[in-house]
Swiss-Prot record:
PANTHER family: PROTEIN ADENYLYLTRANSFERASE SELO, MITOCHONDRIAL (PTHR32057:SF14). One of its GO terms (molecular function) is ATP binding. This is Protein nucleotidyltransferase YdiU. ATP binds at residues 87, 89-90, 110, 122-123, 173, 180, 259.
Length: 481
């Protein structure tokens, strides 16, 4: 595929935020998984990507003529503490290409080796975490949730030393961009307002061109990002997704989910659900995600204040008013999504709100599996109550709720279109990654097949729809990606 061309727009327009760098040589690259559907959408030949030259591209060891791989600079608040210089410590932006729909897309490597931003790290990644990101990001895409995509995972043949010696790997990731709130924080901390302005103009052109001609395009950018993030967080909440590390460097300007390190899907409904081993205070718990998103957006607004108005007081007022809309956008998206999950899309929101509040309390008090409940409720919409009733200990309380729900009308077929049968359940993810680390990719491939077709129940996949057995115990995740 000799005609492949990768642009270097980010590096060209924002050289202060890009360090030209090369991926470390992979001694024995071996393709583990390739996303044929995504490759086709990008105009890439999947057969060529499987060739030795294609695999070398996927690890960054052979790039097209004219391509300028760079490590991107960004800052960020990590668990509330500000770090002025983070950046791509083990990642590289190979460049941008235009996909079949005319959209510019980043082609990005993760685990490609030490960069100037690596600090004490080795810049490498292991097979398990890279396969994990591939699996979960593609599941999120199948669920209709904006996300970075995964093109491939390649084992490098290089050992990676962690608590033990693991097999190294590189993830080839595709995204609308890798611009983050932390990108703006990095630009702002330099004190160079012109750099912040150029970054904002780059973001507008890339993601929100509709605001370019507005009276205040920079305020328009902020409002657009607030709206996109409100929609995104609501979609997370609707499927029980817990990101786990909502630092400002992990909040995108595009409104896509990024960085799947300690993420997981909630089993039994509980707003205090935390999986990350490093989130000991529950900062990024499931129920805290909307407020954390608003906090992150406030940090974004701080970087844009000089662009909003020369008068700092007026700039702050503009920012506060715009940020205030985040909560309204989020609540609107969440309410509409929950109405769809309950089959009540034609019912007025005020009639649904008390029903939803009561339901969430019942789910929490009875320790009900979040995903299983909504699929079982779809059966109740068709007249089969027993599967969903069988989930509850407090039958009297649930039966009363069920009567109230039935009185509002319901649409079981519509419910099945939005309530997944299959999500990346934590015990199945661990099972698949353990097998893959031992050289057996079949469990990974079967799980991937299930979660990338999440809404249609299929024979032979019953265990992929079931909650974890009690013996699985309390789940903890680690930031391996």
């Amino acid at each position: 595929m000799t005609n492949l061309s990768l642009d270097g727009r980010f590096a060209r327009e924002l050289p202060e935020m890009a360090v030209r760098w090369k991926a470390e040589e992979a001694p024995d690259p071996r393709l583990l998984v390739l996303n044929d559907e995504l490759a086709s959408g990008l105009g890439l030949d999947a057969d060529w990507l499987r060739s030795p030259d294609g695999v070398r591209l996927l690890v960054g060891n052979s790039v097209p003529d004219g391509a300028t791989p760079v490590a991107q600079a960004y800052a960020g608040h990590q668990f509330g503490g500000f770090a002025p210089r983070l950046g791509d410590g083990r990642a590289l932006l190979l460049g941008e290409l235009v996909d079949g729909d005319g959209r510019m897309r980043d082609v990005h490597l993760k685990g490609s080796g030490h960069t100037p931003f690596a600090r004490a790290g080795d810049g490498l990644a292991a097979v398990g975490p890279m396969l994990r990101e591939y699996l979960v990001s593609e599941a999120m895409h199948a669920l209709g949730i904006p996300t970075t995509r995964s093109l491939a995972v390649v084992a490098t043949g290089r050992p990676v030393r962690r608590e033990s010696v693991l097999d190294g790997a590189v993830l080839t990731r595709v995204a609308s961009s890798h611009l983050r709130v932390g990108s703006f924080q990095y630009a702002a901390v330099t004190g160079d307002t012109d750099l912040v302005r150029r970054l904002a103009e780059h973001a507008i052109a890339r993601h929100h061109p509709e605001v370019a001609g507005a009276a205040d395009p920079y305020l328009g950018l902020f409002e657009a990002v607030c709206s996109a993030q409100a929609q995104l967080i609501a979609r997370w909440m609707l499927v029980g997704f817990v990101h786990g590390v909502m630092n400002t460097d992990n909040m995108t300007i595009s409104g896509e989910t990024i960085d799947y390190g300690p993420c997981a899907f909630m089993d039994a409904y509980d707003p205090e659900t935390v999986f990350s081993s490093i989130d000991s205070w529950g900062r990024y718990a499931y129920g805290n995600q909307p407020s954390i998103a608003a906090w992150n957006l406030a940090r974004f607004a701080e970087t844009l204040l000089p662009l909003f108005d020369d008068d700092i007081d007026r700039a702050i007022t503009l920012a506060q008013n715009a940020l205030g809309a985040f909560g309204r956008h989020y609540e609107g998206a969440l309410t509409a999504g929950m109405q769809a999950k309950l089959g009540l899309t034609g019912v007025d929101g005020p009639a649904v709100a008390p029903l939803l509040d009561e339901l969430l309390k019942l789910l929490q008090d009875n320790h009900i599996d979040f995903t299983s409940f909504f699929r079982a409720l779809g059966l109740a919409a068709r007249g089969d109550n027993e599967p969903v009733r069988g989930l509850f200990v407090d039958l009297a309380g649930f039966d009363a709720w069920l009567d109230s729900w039935r009185a509002l009308g319901r649409d079981g077929a519509a419910m099945d279109r939005v309530n997944p049968v299959y999500t990346p359940r934590n015990h199945l993810v661990e099972e698949a990654l353990t097998a893959a680390a031992a050289g057996d990719m079949e469990p990974f491939e079967t799980l991937l097949d299930a979660v990338t077709g999440p809404f249609v129940e299929r024979p032979g996949l019953q265990r992929y729809a079931e909650p974890a057995p009690e013996a699985f115990g309390r789940y903890r995740t680690f930031c391996g990606t």
